[in-house]
Amino acid sequence: MTQEPLIRVDNVSFAYRINQSTSIPVLRNVSFSVMSGEYVAIIGHNGSGKSTLSKMLNGILVPETGDVWVSGMNTREKALHRQIRQCVGMVFQHPDNQIVATIVEDDIAFGLENIGVPPDEMKLRVDEALQAVGMSSFRDRPPHHLSGGQKQRVAIAGILAMKPSCIVLDEATSMLDSYGRKEILAVVGKMRREGMTIVTVTHHMSEVAEADRVIVLEEGEIVLEGTPREVFRQHQKLQELHLDVPQASQLALRIHELYPAFQRDLIQNQEIIEEVERHKLRQVEVSGR
């Protein structure tokens, strides 16, 4: 029996209306699916439509034409929006825009109160969510005393407490320093290992390299789609789209040009190290004959 996708985007188009006679097209006939447990990265330069697309995935925005389905629910149905948003939670670029309470644990509980979770279960969910993001010791702190990475972890905890099937990260690390990014990526890695469905919108190619699948947008259309290895193999196309590739991918290609036996489709630093070690071992074996 074929598994149904958790999210299905079907021929979606969207435009921002400036006035009654003027609109700006942002998405054009976009179609893709996200399976349960999958980690999908959406990339594209500024203005490509990726953040607009992310907001389609839980009904914040609704298509002009086409449909978005979440666990069989159409986002056009306003009566289903609460269920859809419990299924697909969003974490945005600025955590301050998501934090509403003056104490960390109260902020985690806020969404649970709104959906009528009983107090005993609420306490359990808050405890579990704070533990999941490594913020249990900060539960009594005011959010404004936290670092950017810590605030973003609180925002993620607030979503996790709702027990969603999928989390959408819309440029969730773009405003953080390197340490804050590492904090969030560690949390994302943990969620992924536990089977959470993740959709991330990002311009950090090192994050994209960790995904199962990459969707590349240009002027509101999908122009590339595949595994990170398949997408990053197309260096020239990515350059034309004004997108970077991971440094590891650039280095692997350069070494391959100089030494064709070296694999060119490497996208992570650890893969480069292992390939270098493999060739060192081969040289030792040859010289020992």
Task: Show which residues each predicted segment covers.
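Conserved ABC ATPase "signature" C-loop
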Residues: 220-221
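Conserved ABC ATPase signature
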Residues: 142-146, 150
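Helix-to-loop junction immediately C-terminal to a conserved catalytic motif
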Residues: 58
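Catalytic Walker B motif of ABC-type/P-loop ATPase nucleotide-binding domains
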Residues: 167-170
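Conserved ABC ATPase "signature" region
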Residues: 120-138
